[in-house]
Every structure is written in C-alpha cells, then in structure tokens.
C-alpha cells in the first residue's frame, strides 16, 4: 500500500525529519526564588498508576507508561489500561493520506509517522487529522513533524507521542486548535509531543471529554506579534452541561513556554497540575495568567516551577459548585501576581507521589526530557 509498511519492512516516500526542539538541561533556581504552600515530595521508587503502571526512577516515572487521570475509567470508576493500538503490528506511514486513513478507521492501529507529513492549515481549512478509538500514533524519531490540526472526537484509548505540531500563529478567529479533544472522548494519553503557535489554542479539551493525561509535552509560542497566545482551554463555556462531572485531566512534567494565558484555564473538571515548568518570554509576549480557575473547576496545583509569570495562580472566576484551586509546594521566580491558592482540592485517585519531584528539580528535568525527544517509537529515556 502506498506510503505505508508493516513493521520490519522498509517504507518509501517519506523524508527523514530533522531533529526537533530538544532542549538542554536547565539550571537550578536562582537565589530569591520562593516556594509556598507546603512541603514537596521527593522522588521515590516504583509505583503503579492504575493497571497502566507508572514505575519510577530517580529522575521521574517510566516514560513508556500512562499515568494520572488517563488510567481511570471515570471520576468514580476503577483503573483501566491505556493501550492504544495494543499489540497490532506497527504500520509506518510516509504520507498524510495514509496517516489519515489508518488513524480514522475502525481497527486497533499502531502507526509510526516517518518524515514531515501534512501541508498545514489556516482558519478551518487545510489538513486535519481525525483520530478514532484504539490508536497509537507516534513519531518514528525525535522531532517528527505533523503539519495538521489534530481532532479526537468521541474516541477512547488513544495514545499520541513524539510529534511536533506547529500552528500558523494565534489569532482571534476561533479557528482550529493544534489539538482538540472533545465529545465523550476518554482515556487519552498525550506524551512527549510539542504544540506550537496554535491558532485558537495549543491543546484544548472540551464538550464532555474525560480522563486525559498530558506528560512531557511542550506547549509553546515562538512567533511574536500575535495576540491570542492562549494555550490550553478546558471547557469552552460555563454552559456546557455535557462536561458536568467530566473533564478530569492530569498535566505532569510539561513545559509551557511564552504562553499568555490558559496554562491551563479550566471549567468543570478535576484538574491535577503537577511538576510542570512555566517560562515567560517577553520578546514573544507577556505571560499574564498561569493556572486559571473557571466555573465549577477543582484544581490541585502542586510542585510546579513558575518563572516570569504575571499571575501564576489565577483564582479567576471561582463560581459554581466545588470551584477551588489548592496550591502546594510550588516555586515562584520573577513572578509578580498571586501565588496562593484558595480552598482544599480533590485527592487524586491514582498513585503519583512516589515519582513526583520537588519543585526545585522541575526545571532541569523538564528542560532535558520534555518534547518530541524520543529516538524511536519504543524509547523510554
């Protein structure tokens, strides 16, 4: 079949992609940085995160296993395994047409993306990748680029890894996001990807989606002169009844770079924001608001490192039932606005503390490992 090959076969027609935005290890926090809200847990030994285990080393969890909310059936349900395409024979795709065909069909698939695929998009026109249930889509090597907006709608058991998605630059037109997860989608794990300069958002989760985990990703902006650098929206309206009791999301070991707001900005869900790095870049645009509350959103903001953020803890609109943001163990450096939470958040129903690191270790760890840095589809650095 054109543009695709099974595992072990040599595929043709795809250009070898260049290395992506692998970042060097960061430095320790500078003198004068402050930590507030309690003590930070130290890195520990092996742990499980539901039936998809999250075993750890001294430098974080096993990076080939899903952790967090993606490993739960629901807010009150038990554990599940996030397997994506499972044991299906990998297919190597070298054209966007083949990637789109396999990603949107009804079979379990493991899809390895080879080369730079897609022709980009603008507004609501161009290449858009529709992903259905039981799919693993992973870049074949570090820096694999996808020039297409990604849409996961009413799909479950999806793994997306090791891809760089670059948008055309943010704008006010409410156009496609780099990644949009919606419509009863659940058990989605997004890992070691990069989302840059999304039009409306970099990676939004809305309209009844649930049990999603983001690990080791970069959500960034590199194009100056754009006014809508609003990265991660959770629910698009206070009037979104299909999201009530859903939109439970974990963000762990991610890096927000030069985002103005929505890091993330939430409604409805139980949101766990832990061990993430936030860095502002005034040359691209001011980072105004960090983790933001909205209608009926319950947030645990834990052991993160905020650098050059206007208001890292944004209590925002704490209206609706159960709206709180508890901030604990965070590190603030060159931040001017609010750094304190309000209320007591939910208790995450999954294991994570044994591989959570202190906020003082987040910068070096995340700068070294976040992004599309995996040398192969099965790499676990």
Which residues are covered by each model-predicted region?
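Ser/Thr-rich, Pro/Gly/Ala-heavy low-complexity intrinsically disordered linkers and tails
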Residues: 1-59
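Boundary/junction segments of secreted and surface-exposed precursor proteins
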Residues: 58-70
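Acidic Gly/Asp/Thr-rich repetitive segments characteristic of extracellular carbohydrate-active
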Residues: 67-112
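Extracellular beta-strand-rich solenoid/capping regions of secreted or surface-exposed proteins
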Residues: 100-110, 118-138, 144-162, 167-185
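Extracellular beta-strand/beta-solenoid scaffold signature
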Residues: 123-126, 147-149, 172-182, 197-206, ...
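Right-handed parallel beta-helix
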Residues: 134-142, 156-167, 185-199, 209-262, ...
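Extracellular beta-rich repeat passengers
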Residues: 265-381
């Amino acid at each position: 079949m054109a543009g695709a090959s099974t595992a072990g076969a040599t595929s043709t027609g795809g250009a070898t992609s260049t290395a992506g935005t692998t970042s060097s290890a960061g430095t320790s926090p500078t003198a004068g940085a402050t930590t507030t809200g309690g003590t930070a847990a130290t890195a520990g030994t092996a742990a499980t995160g539901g039936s998809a285990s999250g075993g750890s080393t001294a430098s974080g969890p096993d990076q080939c296993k899903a952790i967090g909310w993606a490993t739960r059936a629901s807010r009150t349900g038990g554990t599940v395994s996030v397997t994506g395409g499972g044991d299906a024979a990998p297919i190597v795709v070298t054209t966007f047409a083949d990637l789109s065909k396999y990603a949107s069909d009804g079979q379990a698939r493991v899809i390895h993306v080879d080369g730079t695929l897609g022709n980009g998009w603008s507004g609501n026109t161009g290449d858009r990748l529709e992903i259905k249930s039981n799919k693993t889509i992973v870049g074949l090597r570090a820096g694999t680029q996808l020039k297409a907006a990604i849409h996961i709608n009413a799909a479950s058991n999806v793994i997306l890894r090791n891809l760089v998605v670059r948008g055309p630059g943010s704008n006010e037109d409410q156009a496609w996001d780099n990644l949009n997860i919606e419509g009863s989608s659940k058990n989605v794990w997004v890992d070691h990807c990069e989302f840059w300069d999304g039009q409306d958002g970099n990676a939004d989760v809305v309209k009844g989606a649930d049990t999603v985990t983001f690990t080791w990703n970069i959500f960034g902006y590199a194009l100056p002169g754009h006014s809508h650098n609003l990265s991660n929206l959770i629910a698009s309206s206070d009037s979104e009844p299909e999201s009530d009791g859903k939109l439970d999301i974990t963000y762990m070991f991610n890096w927000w770079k030069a985002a103005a707001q929505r890091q993330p900005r939430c409604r409805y869900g139980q949101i766990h924001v832990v061990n993430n790095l936030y860095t502002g870049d005034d040359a691209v645009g001011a980072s105004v608001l960090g983790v933001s509350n909205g209608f009926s959103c319950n947030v645990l903001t834990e052991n993160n490192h905020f650098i050059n953020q206007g208001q890292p803890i944004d209590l925002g609109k704490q209206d609706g039932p159960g709206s709180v943001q508890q901030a604990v163990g965070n590190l603030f450096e060159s931040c001017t606005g609010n750094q304190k939470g309000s209320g007591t958040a939910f208790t995450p129903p999954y294991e994570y503390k044994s591989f959570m690191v202190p906020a003082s270790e987040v910068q070096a760890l995340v700068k070294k490992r976040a992004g599309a840095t995996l040398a192969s589809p099965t790499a676990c650095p």
